């Protein structure tokens, strides 16, 4: 050891282990406008004080480790460390706390959701001193927001490209999700678009399997789009899933979609990765393609109430990393989603400025400045009887995406989209006339059945179908 090293090591350094809270719990800290703020739901192990648990989260997700290290003296911990600045108990839950942590902006690479997540939701989630840990929300400062380009186009450009205004957009996921040949798949796309839908969609499972290679699917779907557009006079689209085993292959598929002059491609955001999403978003922005985002695998991360990460965090990250649409649950369908919680993250996707509202799970005021908005997609176990509720809950700036609720029509593929379009038009007209969809929804659908046999047949098939289970994702 050199004399210089000996001198530095001997001044102010004491080896050993000390409580995290001595360094990382700072209840008097005043947060800065440039800090990234996090709200964690912390469940400490028995005997671990909540302040120590919150400080451990702040430490292990920023500059700290389990013991003091000599190299702490070579930097400024006060400048770079995360700080647990508040602890509050979770009402109605034993031994659960909300720990508020502030992170200096210099800890994060500009324009990188991957780097942000690597720090904030990294190894700390396996920390033994915690029984469980869940990231409930993040406040992204405007200084960091401005380092991202966000969605390739956003809501207004989406509508302008389609030339469709004043109502939700209407879509359908092609079923069965696996097993169709490319030609039969294209036929289903054509029948749906011809019947009145704005979009059809590849299921997230569809990539390039032996029964249907991606290039064949792209060609037959493009043919279906052109034919439906010519016959209806409306602009149509199909979400061509560009997700692949490598980013290079993904980009090759996106390039081929652009060469076919289709309006939109699709990517599996979580299974494909944030980096791939951002790369594809940049390409879509430069080449005039809309980007639809699927959230497959999200429930592995966000379903459990005490561990993981809430979907509102994933939604914020997607808006930063880039996507024009993202699936957001339905409230009324087969997938998990409580109304107020869902509307909270829907606002985080669409609006420019969202105020703190704990009743909807929004822990921090969020200012997106000029970052474009994202269209929420309601999809999963919905049918024509749900149309009034979906229109009332999600409003015009949304995509209502039916799968079995279109292709399960008793008369076949073609009448299904007709029934959905009639139901949507009836609900929008009734709403515009001042009728309350929450009160008169079923009556509005029954009235429309009188002049649409396709809708009447659909209503008869699905009149008893409900998905009524208690939501796990409720705010306490």
Swiss-Prot record:
Keywords: Acetylation, Calvin cycle, Carbon dioxide fixation, Chloroplast, Disulfide bond, Lyase, Magnesium, Metal-binding, Methylation, Monooxygenase, Oxidoreductase, Photorespiration, Photosynthesis, Plastid
EC number(s) stated in the UniProt entry for this protein: 4.1.1.39
Active site: 175
Location in or out of the cell: Plastid, Chloroplast
Chain coiled-coil ranges: none
Cofactor field: Mg(2+)
Binding site for substrate: 123, 173, 177, 295, 327, 379
InterPro entries recorded: RuBisCO, RuBisCo_large_chain_AS, RuBisCO_lsu_C, RuBisCO_lsu_C_sf, RuBisCO_lsu_fd_N, RuBisCO_lsu_N_sf, RuBisCO_lsuI
Protein family according to the UniProt entry: Belongs to the RuBisCO large chain family. Type I subfamily.
Note: The basic functional RuBisCO is composed of a large chain homodimer in a 'head-to-tail' conformation. In form I RuBisCO this homodimer is arranged in a barrel-like tetramer with the small subunits forming a tetrameric 'cap' on each end of the 'barrel'.
Protein name (Swiss-Prot/TrEMBL): Ribulose bisphosphate carboxylase large chain
Naturally occurring in which organism (per UniProt): Barnadesia caryophylla
Biological classification of the source: Eukaryota, Viridiplantae, Streptophyta, Embryophyta, Tracheophyta
